[in-house]
């Protein structure tokens, strides 16, 4: 981690930039609904595509395997494609992404989500949707998947990039590191100005998915849509193991935020987005999976979790489940910051498996303190 705020700020500004190209899905054979293998499909943005799946916790060690946290380490160099395949540096679909960590819930587990995607990258091209990172709009990709498979469930995570979530993180971090001011007052106004339009577009994304499925011959009862919210990657101030004075949150913890801004993000922003997404789900008649508390106690800098060291190995029971802000930019890509890491994705995969077994009703997914990812459980929402 760095010794000066300026190196940290340079990395934080990169949070807003996505890079790389992803391969376009190959053509698939067409089959009548129900005739192909069963499938569960994930669509949307980085929180479901698998961004940050490269990491098993966070470590201050910058060389080698980073105390076992860096799954891209080959023994001599780093190869992100070991985790993200051909989508490395682009859509970043990891091998631990939510749908890939859900277990045997279908014959085919298909990840169409892409890091950095907005709602317009979900809409069909014929309806104004935009290609992204070399790939067709996700609804158009879904059409091919729906024709070749018996799709049973589609999980959607979208809206965060439309709201400018990366910009909010970057602003709040730079306000802590450089400007010594709070971000929550200005950023709340930014969110409030955007959120109605964003939620309308999230609702339209659901409509687009339905239109594709109907065109593929599916009846409403043949499949389910689950709209999910976002987990908080940072803890409340009372749960942060580092004090807000000094540089430990920046240089050691990777969570450079003021107490007031941390509390705003954890207890106002994340719940606001979740509540509005729940409203969209209700209006569109789809299930809602609330993930706001999924990483409770496992967030970056949380007191209940520990960084990985030479004497504290990576563990789903003790390590952080979200990627820190690597302000020196010596470990991986900055776009991985503030996303569920491999452990977090495995936990969210468990959530997906659990709601897959619940055909109706909204649910919240939480973790059990002191256990690994198998300790995830659902409650009524």
Segments (PLM) and residue ranges:
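Catalytic nucleophile-elbow at a beta strand-turn-alpha helix junction centered on a G-D-S/GDSL motif
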Residues: 38-55, 60-61, 66, 70, ...
